[in-house]
């Protein structure tokens, strides 16, 4: 996509620099919310025109892709804590432009470059690149890299984070108790219990699976009439509920205990459109959706 030519690659690189900086400026979670809105708008473009351009280049590309805008914001937050500009490196809500420190925004831009390059690299791996979510995997890699690089106490230097500092672990405990997160290390306390996880996972999964099947079978008719592949809508149907889940993060930012389930709706929608054809005695590639 962004490797068609050197010019296209450089254009995407510049967009990734800006995307990471935007994520740092407005806060990683706000950036992710914008991803959600962009996904829904891009789906409207797909339904109207049959083109996945907006999904590929905007929603999941270097402009609003989570591996750029969210990952850049998350890395900048860890860096800001490392430099002593803020108290909590987990704070991916606060707009970091408010710190008045340009270096924080530059870190977001650098991690935008990292996300851009790593995602392209993963996508190019034979077989693996086409059988995994390269955007999501890049978010994980970027977060781990930022944690290792900046995760230490302020002023202690690079690569001296909690992954390296034994004093930050509980002494005299077994392995699991030793690494058990403290009061500030818990992200979603209301989603920790297995009963709650199963409830949210199953019901939001049904929600996303049903919506994805509806989009695949009904919205897909128009792109097919325009001459596009029959399974075009089905191949992107899981993104729709992912976008809704991303927007729900906006309400989480307002200190509401919202369910965080974008990782559920994305996979559930994908599973629905992949396995429904199997139930019909076909495969995804041979099933006729419209």
What are these regions (language model features)?
Residues 2-290:
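Alpha-helical multipass membrane-protein architecture
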